[in-house]
């Protein structure tokens, strides 16, 4: 049984037409042309792109209802931001325990980019994700009983 969904900067629709798609289409890390290319690698069939597994924003409340608690994290400067936030709203409307957090000043995938590892947004992403896993899964996480200095040291060792 899945106890928690933890999507980071999720793809939730194949329409490519949200305000964040328009605003960040050419000027940030993930561009609209790259996103369209990635969709083409999956399928070029418009019908398949509308299927719920590809575009969960198109799911009905009945299809969404019963999903596990969901903690969505999005980047402010990301073409996927609006659909991630819309997914959080849709899940909540369907009765799912859903939380969406927007991290200001960062781009798509920032939490996985070594050059951005020192940002406070990256640290918040990692620690809040770990805290949610501990809460829903009952597991220990790196920050549970450690000081900021210990976490910084561990982060440096990891890379």
Enumerate the predicted regions with their spans.
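Alpha/beta-hydrolase superfamily serine-hydrolase fold, recognizing
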Residues: 1-159
